[in-house]
Curated annotation (Swiss-Prot):
Protein name in the entry: Gamma-gliadin
Alphabetical UniProt keywords: Repeat, Seed storage protein, Storage protein
Renumbered residue ranges of the record's region Disordered: 18-64
Keyword Repeat: yes
Species this protein is from: Triticum aestivum
Length: 244
């Protein structure tokens, strides 16, 4: 009768002691694996998504602006521009309201006799231009006036920037002059091509062209038909349609 009593508590003690050792290492082991799997895929997905959309729209906007600026450039033969040089001088000086505001402030009004001479020369050359090319020719004259004013403004800015450098560095003047000549050549080529018109210059081109189209045909008694253009003008600038 003494043997079965001590065996039962020993077996139950061994069974209870083995259960926690088998259950404890199984529960915490999958938890760190789940944390690593949740954190690791989240980091690469959020970083590239924030950097992609910032760089994409800016080159597209620059290309659209350059395309619209190129569409506003009149294409005329150089011989026609040389032929209408008296008209350019007449419009550029104070004989007409097309003259630039800076030029009006800097100098006085020309004499009526000189304006009359330029008017006669312009009216002699304008009827010789073919009728279909007169509108683009007048537009090209205004365009060349805007570029000439832009070159003068840039030249004055460059001369102001070069004055303090020449006072501080008098030894390397030949090298500076050669570098300045090399740097001015591509700028003049860019202005000649006309691919860097600013929005305010495009609006100025439209306004000055409309004024010139009111002055020259009436002054010279010449018909200048306006042809509807298919290109879109940016920034709300419109072109007139009709005939003088």
């Amino acid at each position: 009768p003494q043997q079965p009593f001590p065996l039962q508590p020993q077996q139950s003690f061994l069974w209870q002691s083995q259960q926690p050792f088998l259950q404890q290492p199984q529960q915490p082991s999958p938890q760190p694996q789940q944390v690593v799997q949740i954190i690791s895929p989240a980091t690469p997905t959020t970083i590239p998504s924030a950097g992609k959309p910032t760089s994409a729209p800016f080159p597209q906007q620059q290309q659209q602006h350059q395309q619209l600026a190129q569409q506003q450039i009149p294409v005329v033969q150089p011989s026609i521009l040389q032929q209408l040089n008296p008209c350019k001088v007449f419009l550029q000086q104070q004989c007409s309201p097309v003259a630039m505001p800076q030029r009006l402030a800097r100098s006085q009004m020309l004499q009526q006799s000189s304006c009359h001479v330029m008017q006669q020369q312009c009216c002699q050359q304008l009827p010789q231009i073919p009728q279909q090319s007169r509108y683009q020719a007048i537009r090209a004259i205004i365009y060349s006036i805007i570029l000439q004013e832009q070159q003068q403004v840039q030249g004055s800015i460059q001369s102001q920037q070069q004055q303090p450098q020449q006072l501080g560095q008098c030894v390397s003047q030949p090298q500076q002059q050669s570098q300045q000549q090399l740097g001015q050549q591509p700028q003049q080529q860019q202005l000649a091509q006309g691919t860097f018109l600013q929005p305010h210059q495009i609006a100025q081109l439209e306004v000055m062209t409309s004024i010139a189209l009111r002055i020259l045909p009436t002054m010279c008694s010449v018909n200048v038909p306006l042809y509807r253009t298919t290109t879109s003008v940016p920034f709300g600038v419109g072109t007139g349609v009709g005939a003088y």
